[in-house]
A protein has these predicted regions:
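Short C-terminal tail/terminal secondary-structure segment
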Residues: 2-13, 242-278
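Canonical Rossmann dinucleotide-binding motif of NAD(H)/NADP(H)-dependent dehydrogenases/reductases
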Residues: 12-47
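Substrate-binding pocket helix/loop in short-chain dehydrogenase/reductase
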Residues: 108-109, 116-118, 211
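C-terminal substrate-recognition "lid" of short-chain dehydrogenase/reductases
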Residues: 129, 138, 219-248, 253
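A short, exposed helix-loop element centered on a Lys and neighboring polar residues
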Residues: 132-133, 174
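Alpha-helical segment proximal to the catalytic Tyr-Lys
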Residues: 137, 178-182, 239
Length: 278
């Protein structure tokens, strides 16, 4: 079950969220769901999009929140579906877009299948670009784009397609900063490390153990911890923050453990095809 992440009593709600509209992809579960729920907990209206037909747990968790969560099935690689989503908003202003949908592929470079390579790049890079293109006409000054990268996008992991896609997403983010800044639109990217979700449970045990053991904080992250950073970046509290790259990884990247983690994956002899969230 998905639990709503509601601000503690007495906390001041983040400015610029209540009453505004946000779109979050990959929102049927994991950190995407928590991002949608935290926005709704701050009074925002959220379009939670995902490839699944429905997300009943997400909708149930949002029932008692001050904002709203509307679920919509979306293939982020479909230009037509993005266009239909934009048209369905009837010209309502979009305050923020979170490009959270993503998959990985744990495969040696020499074993990468072209079809799998194309799929990872289509979802992780082309999807965010199509979303930005479709919603940009509805975004004005004060709007915000948050792309979800990965610690793999800061170094070289044993996941060639995934790592390449996250480096590319950084480039797309930087282009948005330069091009959209004069229009008052901000763009930032968040780099999660190992985040505990139902989808990361099938990752190789040596990889998970290495994440917990070697990270300076000695634990995995929770989806809510990523959501906290994402929602801050969407809010007016971050009105002068654009071009930021924020790691939510327990210090893994800065402690230089990327090579060890890559070796842990390599040694695990895990099946090649595996889709994981960030």
């Amino acid at each position: 079950m998905i639990a709503a992440s509601t601000p503690d009593a007495g906390c001041v709600a983040l400015p610029g969220l209540s009453g505004n509209l946000f779109v979050v992809t990959g929102a049927a579960g994991g950190q995407g769901a928590q991002e949608a729920l935290l926005l709704a907990a701050n009074g925002a209206d959220v379009i939670a999009a995902d490839l699944r037909e429905d997300a009943p747990d997400l909708r149930a968790a949002a029932d008692d929140l001050p904002g709203s969560v509307t679920y919509r099935r979306l293939d982020v690689t479909s230009e037509e579906q993005w266009r239909d989503l934009a048209d369905s908003l009837a010209g309502r202003a979009v305050k923020g877009l979170v490009n959270n949908a993503g998959v990985t592929q744990r495969t040696r470079i020499g074993d990468v299948v072209r079809e799998d390579w194309d799929r990872v790049l289509a979802i992780n890079v082309t999807g965010p670009m199509l979303g930005i293109q479709a919603l940009l006409p509805l975004m004005g000054p004060g709007s915000s784009i948050v792309n979800i990268g990965s610690a793999a996008g800061l170094t070289g992991h044993y996941t060639a397609a995934y790592t390449t896609s996250k480096w590319a997403l950084r480039g797309l983010t930087h282009s948005c900063v330069t091009e959209l800044g004069p229009r008052g639109i901000r763009a930032n990217i968040v780099h999660p490390g190992y985040i505990r979700t139902e989808m990361t449970a099938d990752a190789p045990a040596p990889f998970l153990d290495a994440n917990v053991t070697i990270a300076p904080l000695h634990r995995g992250g929770e989806p809510e911890e990523v959501a906290n950073v994402v929602v801050f970046l969407l809010s007016d509290a971050a009105a002068y923050v654009t071009g930021a790259e924020i790691g939510v990884d327990g210090g893994q990247f800065r402690s230089g453990v990327a090579t060890f983690l890559s070796e842990a994956v390599r040694s695990a002899q895990h099946p090649a095809a595996s889709a994981l969230p960030h």
